[in-house]
């Protein structure tokens, strides 16, 4: 994890020991589970697990999904032929993928799950270490509705690392505008993209090429982190790969390889066999390691389970309003 991510955490805590620094890389989630298991032995601790907390899925289905749907509908008012072809999101906890459930149900969008090529758990039943921070934890989250996922895409951290230099340097931005003719306004926004944001962008491009989409097809994705979290990573890459400085020529090579060169490799259009293959991988984490009942694991294969939990948001809202009313802190209508 980058230096800036730890510094961000430090600003929000009172005691340094409140942050437990586990060993390993971005894909070493098992070590986090082990640390949480130790904490849970103290009955005063309560573990909130974003990988298995279904409210994470439901929240994105209700909030993120509605927000993205409104964006699509606003564009559709300008182009009645516009079709929502896909929703693209990298899988960390898999919570954000819940937004795709609403977009698929209401508009037929394909749900595209993304991971790091260096740790291709879904794509190739693979493993490894990578630097796309915030995603790709070498397991299948319990809250990932795998059997409703349509496409898997893997993106290399070499692409996200190097494009970070292009998007945040004057040399890179000048190349995009002057040599490629990109809009200065759009290029200026790219400086905000962190590693997983760029990962989603590249996966959207690969999806569009794989599905042979046209001008009336829309793909939506999310920029899930900012480049300010990776200044130290940028410095490290410059020192190791570009010791004489980053140039327009270097930017050209990176863009041609990783942005313009984004192709249909490392993409799988899922059928039922592929979906069940990925779903079954979760057994080892959740049943064997984490002690989830087999029946509770298996019921997630049925889409009726997901439709049921997606209807819980209004119930939770009522409970929140009731609680607020009883405390007197917030007056409810």
Short names for language-model regions:
Residues 1-7, 88-100, 121-122, 195-204, ...:
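Short glycine/serine/threonine-rich phosphate/pyrophosphate-binding segments
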Residues 166, 217-232:
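ATP/nucleoside-binding phosphotransfer catalytic cores, i.e., glycine-rich phosphate-binding loops
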């Amino acid at each position: 994890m980058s230096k800036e991510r730890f510094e961000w955490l430090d600003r929000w805590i009172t005691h340094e020991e409140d942050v437990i620094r586990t060993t390993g890389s971005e894909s070493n989630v098992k070590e986090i589970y082990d640390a949480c298991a130790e904490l849970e032995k103290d009955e005063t601790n309560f573990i909130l697990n974003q990988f298995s907390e279904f409210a994470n899925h439901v929240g994105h289905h209700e909030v993120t999904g509605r927000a993205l749907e409104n964006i699509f509908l606003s564009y559709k008012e300008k182009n009645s032929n516009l079709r929502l072809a896909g929703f693209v999101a990298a899988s960390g906890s898999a919570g954000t993928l819940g937004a795709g459930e609403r977009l698929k149900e209401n508009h037929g969008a394909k749900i595209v799950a993304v991971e790091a090529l260096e740790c291709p758990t879904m794509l190739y039943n693979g493993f490894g270490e990578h630097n796309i921070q915030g995603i790709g934890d070498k397991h299948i989250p319990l809250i990932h509705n795998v059997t409703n996922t349509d496409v898997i895409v893997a993106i290399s951290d070499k692409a996200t690392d190097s494009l970070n230099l292009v998007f945040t340097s004057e040399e890179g931005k000048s190349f995009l505008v002057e040599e490629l003719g990109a809009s200065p306004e759009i290029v200026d926004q790219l400086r905000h993209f962190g590693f997983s944001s760029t990962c989603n962008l590249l996966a959207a491009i690969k999806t569009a090429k794989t599905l042979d989409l046209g001008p009336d097809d829309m793909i939506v994705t999310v920029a899930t982190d900012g480049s300010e979290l990776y200044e130290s990573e940028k410095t490290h890459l410059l020192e190791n790969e570009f010791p004489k400085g980053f140039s327009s020529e270097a930017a050209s090579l990176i863009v041609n390889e990783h942005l313009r060169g984004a192709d249909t490799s490392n993409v799988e259009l899922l059928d039922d066999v592929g979906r069940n293959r990925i779903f079954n991988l979760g057994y080892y984490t959740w049943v064997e390691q984490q002690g989830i009942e087999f029946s509770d694991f298996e019921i997630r294969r049925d889409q009726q389970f997901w439709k049921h939990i997606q209807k819980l948001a209004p119930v939770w809202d009522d409970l929140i309003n009731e609680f607020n009313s009883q405390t007197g802190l917030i007056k409810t209508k």
